Amino acid sequence: MGIIAWIIFGLIAGIIAKLIMPGRDGGGFFLTCILGIVGAVVGGWLATMFGIGGSISGFNLHSFLVAVVGAILVLGVFRLLQRE
C-alpha cells in the first residue's frame, strides 16, 4: 500500500491506539497523530517483511488492523522510552 494510505491509516490508528492505551503521554493530539503515522508505517513494513497475511494493500480491514497494531506498538515503545 502506498505511503499516503499508511499516513491516512496512521492518523486514524493513532487515535484508536490512544483510546486503547489511555494515559498522559505529553504532546497531546499532535504527538498521538505522529506516533500513529509512524506506527502504521512500521506495522505495514513489518507485516510485509514477515509476510503476515499476504500482501498489505489498499484500504481494507486487514491493512487497518496492521496499522492499529503498529501504532499500539510504537506508543508502547514511546512510553517505555519516556520513563527512562
From Swiss-Prot:
Q: What is this protein called?
A: UPF0410 protein YmgE
Q: Which InterPro entries match?
A: Transgly_assoc
Name the domain of life.
Bacteria
Q: Which residues form a coiled coil?
A: none
Q: How is it placed in the membrane, per its record? A: Multi-pass membrane protein
Gene symbol of the encoding locus:
ymgE
Homology family: Belongs to the UPF0410 family.
Q: Which organism is it from?
A: Escherichia coli O127:H6 (strain E2348/69 / EPEC)
What GO cellular-component annotations does this UniProt entry give? plasma membrane
Pfam families the record matches: Transgly_assoc (PF04226)
TM regions (residue ranges): 1-21, 27-47, 58-78
Which of UniProt's keywords are assigned here? Answer: Cell inner membrane, Cell membrane, Membrane, Transmembrane, Transmembrane helix
**Where does it primarily localize?**
membrane
Its localization reads: Cell inner membrane
